[in-house]
From Swiss-Prot:
<dbReference type="GO" id="GO:0043023">
    <property type="term" value="F:ribosomal large subunit binding"/>
</dbReference>
<dbReference type="GO" id="GO:0002184">
    <property type="term" value="P:cytoplasmic translational termination"/>
</dbReference>
<comment type="function">
    <text>Responsible for the release of ribosomes from messenger RNA at the termination of protein biosynthesis. May increase the efficiency of translation by recycling ribosomes from one round of translation to another.</text>
</comment>
<dbReference type="InterPro" id="IPR023584">
    <property type="entry name" value="Ribosome_recyc_fac_dom"/>
</dbReference>
<dbReference type="Pfam" id="PF01765">
    <property type="entry name" value="RRF"/>
</dbReference>
<comment type="similarity">
    <text>Belongs to the RRF family.</text>
</comment>
<dbReference type="InterPro" id="IPR036191">
    <property type="entry name" value="RRF_sf"/>
</dbReference>
<dbReference type="GO" id="GO:0005829">
    <property type="term" value="C:cytosol"/>
</dbReference>
<protein>
    <recommendedName>
        <fullName>Ribosome-recycling factor</fullName>
    </recommendedName>
</protein>
<keyword id="KW-0648">Protein biosynthesis</keyword>
<dbReference type="InterPro" id="IPR002661">
    <property type="entry name" value="Ribosome_recyc_fac"/>
</dbReference>
<keyword id="KW-0963">Cytoplasm</keyword>
Length: 187
């Protein structure tokens, strides 16, 4: 956003970005079900550098509680196995040739409650990001009105549009959180 003009679509895009970031973070939270996104944060020591797991292997979900990691290069199997074990996801791979199988253990009730708290923290951070975007948008509108570049009626209309976008995005964030919470607590 620029100080000399206001674009509601830019505000909506930035708010949507906060929602998308939350969706990505929630996808990484482990539930009792297998999900390929669980392994997204795993970094493998490959070819003298750290690489995301998805650049050296294919991750699939053959069963609801099983992940399968097909390593492309036979020489990388041990490095991938070590990266998964070191990732603090609580997963121990069973290696069969170039395929690693990861059984997803049941989560106990305490761990589920912990994960719900983490999900709430992620959601609150996303809400704060949305509020910052709203504040930035409202500040620009106020400056434009003070500089007499827009009328007071336009200011009120734009303020209302920004608030509507904020409410819609916060509602979307709340829905993402509710869905993830339900998924985590489902035994």
């Amino acid at each position: 956003m620029q100080s000399e003009k206001f674009d509601i679509n830019e505000v909506k895009r930035r708010m949507h970005g906060a929602s998308q970031a939350l969706q990505h973070e929630l996808g990484g939270l482990r539930t009792g079900r297998a999900s390929a996104s669980m392994l997204e944060p795993v970094q493998v020591d490959a070819y003298g550098t750290h690489m995301p797991l998805n650049q050296v292997a294919t991750v699939s979900v053959p069963e609801p509680r099983l992940l399968s990691v097909q390593v492309w290069d036979k020489s990388m199997v041990k490095a991938v196995e070590k990266a998964i074990v070191d990732s603090n996801l609580g997963l121990s791979p069973a290696t069969e040739g170039q395929v690693l199988r990861l059984r997803i253990p049941e989560l106990n009730q305490d761990r589920r409650k912990e994960l719900v708290k983490v999900a709430h923290k992620y959601a609150e951070a996303a809400r704060v990001a949305v509020r910052h975007v709203r504040r930035d948008g409202l500040d620009i509108i106020k400056k434009l009105e003070k500089a007499h570049e827009i009328s007071e009626d336009d200011q009120k209309r734009l303020d209302h549009e920004v608030q509507k976008a904020t409410d819609a995005t916060i509602s979307e964030i709340d829905q993402l959180l509710a869905n993830k919470e339900k998924e985590i607590l489902t035994v």
